[in-house]
Amino acid sequence: MDMSATPDRFAVVIDDESIILAGMEIMLDTWGYQVLAAEDVETVLAKLPGCPLPNVILSDYRLRDGWSGITAVRAVREACGVTVPAIILTGDTGAELMAAAKADQIRILHKPVQPNDLRRQIDSLIAVG
């Protein structure tokens, strides 16, 4: 990823399904975002130094190596030193997930998510963030 120019909009995307990750990256790119996309949290954390401050973090909930979307968002926020607006995309509807997301100020979107709905959610998070 070329970070030579600071983008107006920068997103971090984490999803361990490569096809979904690629689709999210292409979609965000068409919306004018520069994207740091990775299948695991460790890769994001390794590439994050030197990147612009993200406008938004998008993560799947169930990730590999024992990570969840909640812990991934926490790790990226800690690395950035600020509470970056975040959305977790999931099929899960459990009360534990909802409570953790609320406590960490993370928005939950249930799959399947339509692109226009995702864009509206991102725009509204950035507007208040």
Task: Describe the role of every protein-language-model region.
Residues I19, T43, S68:
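Residue-level recognition of oxygen-bearing side chains
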Residues P52-N55, C80-P85:
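His-Asp phosphorelay/catalytic-motif detector in bacterial-type signaling
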Residues S18-L36:
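Two-component/phosphorelay signaling modules centered on CheY-like receiver
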Residues G91-G94:
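Short, polar loop motifs at secondary-structure junctions
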Residues D60-A75:
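Conserved phosphotransfer microenvironments
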Residues V12, E25, L36-V56, R64, ...:
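Acidic, metal-coordinating helix/loop segments flanking the phosphotransfer/catalytic sites
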Residues M1-V12, S18, E25, R74-T83, ...:
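Non-catalytic signal-transmission and effector/linker regions of two-component phosphorelay proteins
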Residues I87-L89:
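Hydrophobic/aromatic residues positioned on beta-strands within the core alpha/beta folds
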